[in-house]
């Protein structure tokens, strides 16, 4: 098994608008989330390479610390297009699996990644971890990477399964708590602070949102 991770990253100035932060606080938050996610993935023995797809130079500067592949997303026309750019790169490589993560799941651990890949037992398969509210996709393993077209930004992980069902009978939903925790709203922030799973990250979130 040879696996790469794909992380599509929107320009910081256009990200996380629902959080109602200043441009500078949004940038600080995005950097915090991305660095934590990249740090976790880079420590996983199951993932050999990380692919960053973005239009943001600062994203690639952060990615250099983790030896990421850089793919420039000139149009930034959505997550699905970003994934297709990564898929084009993967098609010329020897990776057998890909896993897509968003940048805003900082509470994920390497143990969670191990657990996720324990579900990966079929050659042609799709494994999905939804968000806490079941209104999005927080992890998506595709074996092989081109087995299906992704359907992000449609309001539910179920659309991913509709796409997967056209290509394989092996598709699974994995409920892995820490991967399901993302930062999309103030409610999400309050929820994760109550859990205090990674105290250092929670402290930094409190500082950004001025909750301390």
PLM segments and residue spans:
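N-terminal nucleotide-binding beta1-loop-alpha1 segment
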Residues: 1-19
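Short aromatic-hydrophobic micro-motifs that form the base-stacking/packing surface
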Residues: 99-101
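Short, glycine-/small-residue-rich phosphate/pyrophosphate-handling segment
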Residues: 142-164
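Conserved alpha/beta core of the MobA/IspD/sugar-nucleotide pyrophosphorylase nucleotidyltransferase superfamily
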Residues: 162-212
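A short, N-terminal amphipathic alpha-helix
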Residues: 31-47
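Short phosphate-binding loop-to-helix
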Residues: 64-97, 156-157
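Acidic donor-binding segment of Leloir-type glycosyltransferases
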Residues: 45-70
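Conserved donor-nucleotide/metal-binding helix-loop-beta segment in metal-dependent transferases, i.e.
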Residues: 108-134
């Amino acid at each position: 098994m040879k696996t790469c991770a794909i992380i599509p990253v929107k320009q910081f100035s256009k990200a996380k608008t629902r959080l109602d932060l200043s441009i500078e606080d949004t940038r600080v938050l995005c950097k915090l989330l991305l660095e934590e996610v990249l740090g976790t993935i880079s420590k996983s023995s199951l993932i050999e390479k990380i692919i960053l797809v973005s239009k943001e130079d600062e994203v690639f500067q952060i990615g250099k610390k983790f030896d990421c592949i850089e793919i420039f997303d000139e149009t930034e026309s959505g997550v699905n297009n970003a994934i297709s750019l990564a898929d084009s790169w993967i098609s010329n490589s020897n990776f057998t699996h890909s896993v897509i993560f968003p940048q805003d799941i900082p509470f994920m651990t390497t143990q969670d990644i191990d657990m996720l890949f324990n579900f990966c037992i079929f050659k042609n398969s799709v494994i999905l971890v939804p968000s806490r509210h079941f209104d999005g996709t927080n992890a998506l393993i595709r074996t092989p990477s081109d087995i299906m077209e992704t359907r992000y930004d449609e309001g539910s992980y179920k659309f991913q399964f509709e796409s997967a069902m056209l290509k394989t009978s092996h598709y699974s939903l994995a409920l892995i708590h820490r991967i399901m925790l993302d930062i999309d709203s103030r409610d999400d922030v309050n929820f994760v602070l109550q859990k205090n799973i990674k105290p250092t990250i929670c402290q930094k979130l409190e500082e950004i949102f001025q909750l301390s």
